[in-house]
Amino acid sequence: MYSNHNLNSDDCCFDWNEEKAAELQRTGVSFDRSLTPQSLRTSTRRLSEENKQQSGTMHIDTSPSVVSDIISSRRDRSQDFFGPHSSSPIAPSERQRADQRSRLESMRLTRRRDKMTKVRGGLEKMEEMIMQGEHLREMQRLKQEAQKNALPSDMAEYMEWQNNEDLEDDELLAFIEKQETYKNELEHFLNNANKNVYENNSYPNSHT
């Protein structure tokens, strides 16, 4: 059976039971493991401090402080000025994106209109060239037809003389017809005049 005594480095004897009792006294526990009044006071003080800390934490969580109000107001002002914090500070706003889309759409329409104008101008030039070509071909065809159907020079002179003869004959016939007309009118006038003279002469004789 071992002894409760031992030697220190300086060959002094010490008692293990006394050392353990002193350690237990420092921790507030008796030698037989029961609580002492000192240990109860220590435990009570520790529990009260923990309760205060918990109640302080609950109070901070449930009621906003002045600091949290300041932080919240600054956050609201910054969101109103710079936009939500979730977006990048260099990202464009919705209005800027709408303006960019509008400018891009306007540029696309202008480019498309210019392209259509160029195409239309090319088509108009092509149509004009085609019409000029058709006109030249038609003139060439008419010229060839005229040369093909052209009369010889002697035939043309004969036809011109014949036309002149026909014109002279027509003029002679017209003169003869006018002469006959004048002759008939003169005879009719003379007959009417003689008739009037006869009637005038017979009228006084009937009264006598």
Swiss-Prot record:
Q: Where is this region: Disordered?
A: 28-105
Q: Does the keyword Transmembrane apply?
A: no
| Claim: Glycoprotein is one of the keywords in the record | no
Q: Tell me the classification of the organism that encodes this protein.
A: Eukaryota, Fungi, Dikarya, Ascomycota, Saccharomycotina
- Any one Gene Ontology biological process term? double-strand break repair via homologous recombination
Q: What else is known?
A: Present with 259 molecules/cell in log phase SD medium.
What does the function comment of this entry state? Involved in regulation of Ty1 transposition. Inhibits Ty1 transposition at a post-transcriptional and pre-integrational stage of the Ty1 retrotransposition cycle.
Comp. bias intervals (Low complexity) = 60-71
The protein's name in its UniProt record:
Regulator of Ty1 transposition protein 105
Query: Per the record, where are the segments of Polar residues compositional bias?
Result: 33-42
Which superkingdom does the taxonomy of this entry point to?
Answer: Eukaryota
Q: Name one GO cellular component term.
A: cytoplasm
Alphabetized GO MF terms:
nuclear import signal receptor activity; protein carrier chaperone
State the compartments where it is located. Cytoplasm; Nucleus
Specify residue ranges for compositional bias: Basic and acidic residues: 94-105
Q: Which UniProt keywords apply?
A: Cytoplasm, Nucleus, Transposition
> What gene makes this protein?
RTT105
